UniProtKB/Swiss-Prot annotation:
SMART domains: THUMP. It comes from Mus musculus. GO terms for cellular component: cytoplasm; cytosol; nucleolus; tRNA methyltransferase complex. Catalytic subunit of the THUMPD3-TRM112 methyltransferase complex, that specifically mediates the S-adenosyl-L-methionine-dependent N(2)-methylation of guanosine nucleotide at position 6 (m2G6) in tRNAs. This is one of the major tRNA (guanine-N(2))-methyltransferases. Also catalyzes the S-adenosyl-L-methionine-dependent N(2)-methylation of guanosine nucleotide at position 7 of tRNA(Trp). Coiled coil: none annotated. Keywords: Cytoplasm, Methyltransferase, RNA-binding, S-adenosyl-L-methionine, Transferase, tRNA processing, tRNA-binding. It is found in: Cytoplasm. The gene is Thumpd3. This is tRNA (guanine(6)-N(2))-methyltransferase THUMP3. It catalyses: guanosine(6) in tRNA + S-adenosyl-L-methionine = N(2)-methylguanosine(6) in tRNA + S-adenosyl-L-homocysteine + H(+); guanosine(7) in tRNA + S-adenosyl-L-methionine = N(2)-methylguanosine(7) in tRNA + S-adenosyl-L-homocysteine + H(+).
Length: 505
């Protein structure tokens, strides 16, 4: 085990759950065997409407059964603790949490006082042990990553001070850029095979130290090092006689009494979640401090698409190796960047008519390349992605040269106008049908202006066939993602069709 892993293990044991202050020796075979049998339920929030897509990713990458909650935008699946690294590498999830206990049919009392009293009594009856171990491992590795990042930044500064010239300054700048990224960049840290091995070892250490713990020992350990916590209640349903704040207040007070933790609404260590949807109640512990959807974007625009939503749209069209994937209205480039990260055997083109948008997309691509070089520790040959400025109604692409088109079309709210969409949408669909391969091409288009899009699509039935529609919520706006299939009919330019002659292409 490496020195930094030992340091992380000591740090973890410094706040271990059974009060054992002595170093714990690691018995490799026994501990690994135990860790493999420790199963926990992980919950994840996903873009509303893409629950099936996220569940498919879980089944594909984790080989785990996944169930979709009746509360929209959430999925649940069981994993071994040592698979935590793979969970953080999922592309379709926004936030992660470990489930403490789930009540599928919780019986609420008739009065507010009785319900809140039940919440107070519930805190001491829950199986906190395993979820807190998972939270512990997750927190320890985030701290380790922060220390490594700080060390890399310091090393870069030292090289610059030693007169390494522009190259050292550039390298230091890259490391500074990496250090400014958010908690979501823990994804890259977890993707390292060496880190995955360290996770298994650390899991063993924690399980060994917590082997014989009880609820009483949990409470005792919090006294030397008091954790700060808060309770967040997410409630949906009309038949509740209490508010979210009341539930969080009383449940949080009971947790404080049980663990002797200190309540802190802003600078907290542990966030306990109380999710209530009708009669379904789930108590959980958050594993992410902020959403993972910002993972690839550093230069934001007025309508930047969430990376998790971009992944869901790309997954809908099932990219195959060597596919040419185009986003003709790319904005900040969220869709092509997500595509280049996950489907590196395809070629991705980001285009927009706004030079500011193209510049943002180019900067985001450059940042992604820099991050890849820092993560791998070596110079890479680049990414299968490029950005270009063009007119969506007159794309500089050959006819039938594109396999997939994925784009976020103007809603007519923050960008463009609904009046202009009546001319823009038909022209876009016509030009997309020209560059898309007949018979095999597909398009995934996101829009909130459903009336205009439906009208435009009705006039394109000879070249586009609607396959599926996913209803999503974008910042409170009810939008739709349309999956279209290109028909086998060859594109005929309107001018050639009117004159009755064969098109030049």
């Amino acid at each position: 085990m490496s020195c930094d892993t030992q340091e992380a293990t000591r740090e973890c044991l410094g706040m271990n759950l059974d009060g054992n202050k002595e170093p714990v020796s690691l018995v490799e075979s026994g501990v690994r065997s135990e860790s493999e049998h420790l199963q926990v339920t992980i919950g994840a929030t996903v873009p509303t409407g893409f629950e099936q897509t996220a569940a498919g990713e879980v089944r594909e990458k984790l080989k785990s059964a996944c169930r979709i909650s009746k509360d929209r935008g959430k999925i649940y699946f069981d994993i071994a603790v040592e698979s935590l690294a793979q969970v953080h590498c999922l592309r379709s999830v926004d936030n992660l949490f470990v489930v403490v206990q789930e009540f599928k049919d919780y019986q609420f009392k008739d009065t507010k006082e009785e319900v809140l009293r039940d919440f107070e009594e519930l805190a001491g009856k829950l199986p906190w042990s395993d979820p807190l171990k998972v939270w512990q491992i997750n927190t320890t590795f985030k701290k380790k990553k922060a220390k490594r990042r700080k060390a890399n930044q310091s090393a870069g500064k030292e090289k610059a001070d030693c007169g390494q010239g522009d190259k050292a300054d550039e390298k230091d700048g890259k490391k500074k850029h990496a250090s400014s990224t958010s908690d979501s960049h823990i994804l890259d840290y977890y993707e390292n095979p060496a880190i995955k091995e360290e996770i298994s070892t650390l899991v063993g250490d924690v399980l060994s130290s917590c082997k014989d713990e009880t609820g009483q020992s949990l409470r005792e350990e919090t006294e030397p090092q008091v954790q700060k916590f808060r309770v967040t209640c997410n409630r949906a349903g009309e038949k509740h006689c209490f508010t979210s704040n009341e539930a969080a207040r009383d449940f949080g007070g009971a947790i404080q009494e049980y663990f002797k933790w200190k309540a802190d609404m802003t600078n907290f260590d542990v966030e306990v979640l109380l999710n209530i949807h009708d009669n379904e109640v789930i108590v959980a512990i958050a594993l992410t401090e902020e959403s993972l959807h910002r993972r690839n974007i550093t230069h934001f625009g007025p309508t930047t698409l969430r990376s998790t939503l971009a992944y869901g749209m790309l997954r809908l069209c099932e990219p195959k190796p060597t596919d040419v994937i185009v986003d003709p209205m790319c904005g900040t480039g969220a869709i092509p960047i997500e595509g280049a990260t996950e489907w590196s055997h395809c070629y991705h083109i980001a285009g927009d008519n706004n030079p500011l948008a193209v510049n943002r997309a180019a900067n985001n691509i450059s940042s992604l390349l820099t991050k890849s070089q820092i993560k791998d520790g070596k110079t890479t040959w680049g990414l299968p992605i490029d950005a270009v400025q063009w007119d969506i109604c007159n794309l500089p692409l050959r006819t039938a040269s594109v396999d997939i088109i994925v784009t976020d079309m103007p809603f007519g709210k923050r960008m463009g106008s609904k009046k202009r969409n009546w001319n823009l949408y038909p022209a876009c669909l016509r030009e997309m049908s020209r560059v898309c391969r007949p018979g095999t091409g597909r398009a995934v288009l996101l829009t909130q202006d459903k009336k205009c899009f439906t009208k435009a699509l009705s006039g394109m039935g000879h070249v586009w066939r609607k396959v599926h529609v996913v209803w999503v919520n974008i910042g409170g706006l009810h939008a739709a993602v349309y999956l279209l299939k290109r028909t086998a009919q060859a594109f005929v330019h309107p001018s050639d069709q009117d004159e009755g002659r064969d098109p030049p292409w």
